[in-house]
Amino acid sequence: MAQRREPDPPPPQRRILRTQTVGSLGEAMLDSEVVPSSLVEIAPILRVANEVEASNPRVAYLCRFYAFEKAHRLDPTSSGRGVRQFKTALLQRLERENETTLAGRQKSDAREMQSFYQHYYKKYIQALLNAADKADRAQLTKAYQTAAVLFEVLKAVNQTEDVEVADEILETHNKVEEKTQIYVPYNILPLDPDSQNQAIMRLPEIQAAVAALRNTRGLPWTAGHKKKLDEDILDWLQSMFGFQKDNVLNQREHLILLLANVHIRQFPKPDQQPKLDDRALTIVMKKLFRNYKKWCKYLGRKSSLWLPTIQQEVQQRKLLYMGLYLLIWGEAANLRFMPECLCYIYHHMAFELYGMLAGSVSPMTGEHVKPAYGGEDEAFLQKVVTPIYQTISKEAKRSRGGKSKHSVWRNYDDLNEYFWSIRCFRLGWPMRADADFFCQTAEELRLERSEIKSNSGDRWMGKVNFVEIRSFWHIFRSFDRLWSFYILCLQAMIVIAWNGSGELSAIFQGDVFLKVLSVFITAAILKLAQAVLDIALSWKARHSMSLYVKLRYVMKVGAAAVWVVVMAVTYAYSWKNASGFSQTIKNWFGGHSHNSPSLFIVAILIYLSPNMLSALLFLFPFIRRYLERSDYKIMMLMMWWSQPRLYIGRGMHESALSLFKYTMFWIVLLISKLAFSYYAEIKPLVGPTKDIMRIHISVYSWHEFFPHAKNNLGVVIALWSPVILVYFMDTQIWYAIVSTLVGGLNGAFRRLGEIRTLGMLRSRFQSIPGAFNDCLVPQDNSDDTKKKRFRATFSRKFDQLPSSKDKEAARFAQMWNKIISSFREEDLISDREMELLLVPYWSDPDLDLIRWPPFLLASKIPIALDMAKDSNGKDRELKKRLAVDSYMTCAVRECYASFKNLINYLVVGEREGQVINDIFSKIDEHIEKETLITELNLSALPDLYGQFVRLIEYLLENREEDKDQIVIVLLNMLELVTRDIMEEEVPSLLETAHNGSYVKYDVMTPLHQQRKYFSQLRFPVYSQTEAWKEKIKRLHLLLTVKESAMDVPSNLEARRRLTFFSNSLFMDMPPAPKIRNMLSFSVLTPYFSEDVLFSIFGLEQQNEDGVSILFYLQKIFPDEWTNFLERVKCGNEEELRAREDLEEELRLWASYRGQTLTKTVRGMMYYRKALELQAFLDMAKDEELLKGYKALELTSEEASKSGGSLWAQCQALADMKFTFVVSCQQYSIHKRSGDQRAKDILRLMTTYPSIRVAYIDEVEQTHKESYKGTEEKIYYSALVKAAPQTKPMDSSESVQTLDQLIYRIKLPGPAILGEGKPENQNHAIIFTRGEGLQTIDMNQDNYMEEAFKMRNLLQEFLEKHGGVRCPTILGLREHIFTGSVSSLAWFMSNQENSFVTIGQRVLASPLKVRFHYGHPDIFDRLFHLTRGGICKASKVINLSEDIFAGFNSTLREGNVTHHEYIQVGKGRDVGLNQISMFEAKIANGNGEQTLSRDLYRLGHRFDFFRMLSCYFTTIGFYFSTMLTVLTVYVFLYGRLYLVLSGLEEGLSSQRAFRNNKPLEAALASQSFVQIGFLMALPMMMEIGLERGFHNALIEFVLMQLQLASVFFTFQLGTKTHYYGRTLFHGGAEYRGTGRGFVVFHAKFAENYRFYSRSHFVKGIELMILLLVYQIFGQSYRGVVTYILITVSIWFMVVTWLFAPFLFNPSGFEWQKIVDDWTDWNKWIYNRGGIGVPPEKSWESWWEKELEHLRHSGVRGITLEIFLALRFFIFQYGLVYHLSTFKGKNQSFWVYGASWFVILFILLIVKGLGVGRRRFSTNFQLLFRIIKGLVFLTFVAILITFLALPLITIKDLFICMLAFMPTGWGMLLIAQACKPLIQQLGIWSSVRTLARGYEIVMGLLLFTPVAFLAWFPFVSEFQTRMLFNQAFSRGLQISRILGGQRKDRSSKNKE
């Protein structure tokens, strides 16, 4: 199945060019949306034509004709893209329609138009105006727009026919025109005068905000200003500063909603007069301007926010300031990523605003102050935004799509940080075009030498504050304190272990202590290295640095160098008997004087004094915060030396409690790690090292360059290197262990996993309603309810329902049932399960007890009956049994009470009523006295029960003809009660019952006089309410469900969701506010071009195995498919297919199970549904509450038209609190090309009317003046909603669905300059509303039950959580919903699940370093919109755009928290290639983060322990992963050196050398990381916590059986390769991983292309190393270490080589193998070249693989060459081991001779290559003879050498092992030096050699796979292993993979 199944796009509109049939052309043109972008103005006319066509085809024709004319006027030369085709098609249609429509028209077209226009006005507009209420504003708006278009056409037709327009029509048109101005499409608030009756406009808070904005008193308007109705201060700002009209409309609504929402929180009871509260204004203003004021303070400027002294004007002034900021922000486009640039613009414009209001006079002109950029239309966009935007755009072009080095272009951060320096004011206002900010680059300036001379100051600014240079040194530079700490600890440990006894106590011995103090010399050297690095890596930013910063860098180097000298000298002087280097230093400084250790100690104390100060500040974070924020010069001087002054990264320190928690975490971790390193790795290695250094080895196996070197340094390095690498890496292992323990404890204290199973849910269900009302229902603010809420819920059990609980029960029922109904709508449960899970909606006034959902009470009645029947009068026994099971008690009591009510309701007759009352009063008496069992005979109960069930069944049917049967049933019941059950009772009862039937016995009474019993019954029940139906149905369930409902719901997902939701109610969450008082929020989803809704074709299209998506889904979700069929009332699939109306239902069902936009939208719209229900529960009066929300929904249609109804109010509140914007970047492109995705998005908008779609509109504008008409693209940010649905006039045709433009804001140019996704979010963020902003990806999902908790979650923004600041990002947990697809998907979802739960829990608390990891986090919207938005967008460097939002938030004093009582669904990748692409993207992103300024600043501004947290949870994880792989390399190359040099043989007698415990410990650590231990630990803990440790153990074993270790080892290679490559060479890019279902087989060539460089090459290299070691190694045979090392590393090799084939579906199926081989051969031998994609030819792929070297720079290429040299070691070592030379000749000439052999072979290959080109066509025979001779010569020489014998078979193998790596090394060097090789003209030979190597590698990989494919059981085993997860869900995967072939063959036979 395709990785990313794009729906096949329907043909674009250009198909109209072709000659088509009349019908199809007509259909194509009917779509008024498929219009070229340059003719966008005619779309409304075509819409109207479609609308009126059914009622008057001639008018439709005239509209289209007018559209054609207008199109011709707009683009006379048809120069726009697609215009000529469009016009031609339209003309063809007009020619056809002219003839057909002429017949039915009136005398002339003018008359036709006039009469139709009047008809339309009367029929639609007047009818709507005359309606009882004019609430249907949307239809009115639509009608006015249509009328306006009709008049435009009418006027044109009249002009053509020279007819005057009638006065009556002109008068009508004037009315229409006036109203069209008022009735414009709106987003949320209709602000026109006629909309005051709309529910949302009636809210006092909205009225207050609107009134405040309309106060324009005292504003100086321009001279020619005409006053408009409802003018407000934003109109004034627009006229003064030249903002766009739609920007003003958008921000007006934004500001009103913002103020209204904050205002209502100040007044919880909104009865006051609508006057805006000053506190609300102050709160919003504080949030909006906190960053601006901080910026002014930082630069030492006074802010421009001057408030007037007159109190009455203060409010207006504040609103003006806020309005101005929002208008600037709303039009700033890409400048929104540069918050301080916006501050600069605002600073000047606000000052101008103040000047105008104060009436200031300009000292320059002597006139009143005016805005520098005037108030013409679009002045702000053209004159302020565009120049800065163009600078960004130019810089982005220089990045060449991210290929250039970061240091040669300025990214968003560089441009923004220009405004962090006081120099930014040189830019001036109006801004100087020649300012250095705008200045061109050095290259551009070289072209304009003359200008440079005249204005030498204006050179390219260069980078600002920081340079992102590709270098590993960034890891040391950003986290220098960490590396210094580890290096110094290592030195100290080695010194202690080396000297004295090796015990830690030895440190107290004088000499040892003094030696340990040498770490301070190392510290000084490291400081010097850091200072030098700082200068080297910041060199390219020197132009932007101030003198103070440059001075600091130089002084840092000077000071560090001085300290190195001082430390070294004083150390030398501290020794009495100095030796070695100490003596040398002493001699330099004339040192024969006595020793003085005290001098060294003094030096150390002085050196440490700054550190002591910082340690003191660390203990008191509040002092540190104060100092960093302070602007006092002395403070600034103090801080200047420790860290350069920077606008961000100040005052980030946490509270003392948080600091204590994470400090303790790290102290425990570091002590454990260092103790382990010392006792297991370093101390045991010292003894063997000393022994090795004592031995002298004189015999070598190769030519030794330094035969007399002392101490065997090579051996020591080979021994210590892996251990030291593991020392630096294993903190990651300790982090995994400690964080798992801490996370587990933390989770347990948060009460996670208290309800894990259905059994637990049942046992706790009694306390759920209480917890529900405590958590999800707003409480009164009385003191009692303020107490900790849920402590009481344990004890709270509702048996009886006191009257005060009526409302609580009703609220619980409404919400619970909404959740269960959503389960049913999602097909997670069947109808029967739904009935069992529902709680009665309607409270029954006759029952005074809680009515539990039937799934708790199922089968309780039959069991109770059996117990009662067999009780034999033992009352107490039965009572005991009932007391144990409270649900049984409830069931019995409810059934009895309902039975009583039912009989009393049915029976109307007086006499019967009396009898029944007597019976019930007797029974009640017995119940009260507790003598029921002893006094009554209950053995007849089952019979009575049977009769009662029959009665209920008749009542369910409710048919007239059953009345007689009911009478019989009632008589049977009466007889049973009086004769059997109550036989001992008073005889009068019997008398009453039986003697009353007939008056006399002896005489035949006439029929009409005979009186029947139960003749008067209320049956059938005519007034059947929903409540009555529900009651009867429930009673029927209680009585008839015999089997236990223990497994209800049976669906695993439904169980998981129910248990999680129930559990979350007992977790700590903020109390719920009323909907009206909650924080408002938006959801923003970026969408590019993924699937919106699966098409039927896409669902049924089969892959090569004959499997369609639909078939696959049916097999994976069998229960949900059955439930779906039940919901749509179909028995089977055939029935479903037969009904066309269900096609869309089927598409939706499938789309809800994929990763589609439809699924995401449905999930997010649950928020709205939840808000509407909660608003109802908040506002409903008791009577309405008890009637229920269902009753309200039933009347919603009519109610929505009246603004005052409860339904309308609920809708209004939901609108005010929640907005959902989907940013469909390419919507207009899709729409104009007729793409199915645009139609599907429109369908979504129609289904959910409150969705808004934002998109970037590209409009071509043609310039008519020029000869051919040049095109210019204009870009807009647009927002649309679904237009009200209108049927074409007088037609029965389907409803026409269209969108409606709300805002269209012009942009300065293309919006996408950097990374696509953040830019897409940024353009749409202006259309979001509210105080919270949730970012949701389009592969996410949400649930109804979680949506109810949203208002609680938003309250977290107002709590400090024991810290120093409120949260700015709320983290949420995610649930990965794609885990059931395959084993890989299961591993991936487990890994992701553990990260998004336990991982982030620990990051947030205690570590305080949680950032933002993808979505569904919720941002404090105002905080982030004033600080650069919700992500960063610079090309490549911000590849992981989301984490940078977290970095930015933290650096700007934000606070990120994590909350686990709410969850959001998320889809993940499900195939190995998809997963690897995802891992590659993340690793690339981490590589770029390593170079970034944000991480550097965090590393330097955090305190030491928080910095450790930051490192090990971001790039540290990837660097440690890389060290893990490096350890294996270093170990093996070290062994290679020992083995081939003969040193291992010489040392093999040393027992310590053989039993090397430290190496065992080190490599065991490496193996732990390799097999995924770091992943598995937190995974197991989280599963244990949430599903029980028993389950965790089972899952762990299952994962191992399904080769999880293979998967994790393989991913290790992916992470290492892409992280390393990004750091060395760059080349990071966004990789779209696809959202499809992967059960398709990946071809061998595809796997080879993807994994060749990342895994296969490295795997083969390690294999050769292991083979050499296996052949020549001596020392370890039979030792545990040997086995451990061999097994572990061979496991890695085999995994890296064969995992892609192991995890490839059908990877071992013989037919597939044969196809793969053919495909591979075709690919490898295909010629490349321009236009040949890498998938088609090896040559193209190979060239693309080398692309990263082109942009790598000198450093990268040098490193590549240096690393390639390692391949020459094999040849050097192995030639001396050939039998000819071994032990005989160690001359260097032997090695030289081996190079002659290689060169000889290469020359022959080259010669044959040249021969092929020269002779193969004309002299083919000659060429073949030469080839044959060469081959025979080679064979003859080989046979001679073997016969003599000069060489052996083993030697041949050794030669292969020696020469293969050499060739590869030469190839790597040639690739790195490609330009040089091309100049030499031997590039084609290099290519040939490379192809040869690829063929050999391909064969090596393919042969074992093909061999295994011979055995059929291998394929069977692989399928089992891959799809075990799916098996457990009843998925017959063999049928999926090999499936449906039978179906196909049978179809073929037919």
Curated annotation (Swiss-Prot):
EC top class, as a word: transferase
InterPro entries to which the protein is assigned, alphabetical: FKS1-like_dom1 (IPR026899), Glyco_trans_48_dom (IPR003440), Vta1/CALS_N (IPR039431), Vta1/CALS_N_sf (IPR023175)
Positions on the Cytoplasmic side per record topology: 1-481, 527-552, 621-655, 734-1511, 1582-1591, 1677-1682, 1777-1787, 1850-1851, 1916-1950
Localization annotation: Cell membrane
Primary location group: membrane
Keywords: Cell membrane, Cell shape, Cell wall biogenesis/degradation, Glycoprotein, Glycosyltransferase, Membrane, Transferase, Transmembrane, Transmembrane helix
Entry superkingdom: Eukaryota
Name of this protein: Callose synthase 1
Provenance organism: Arabidopsis thaliana
Name of encoding gene: CALS1
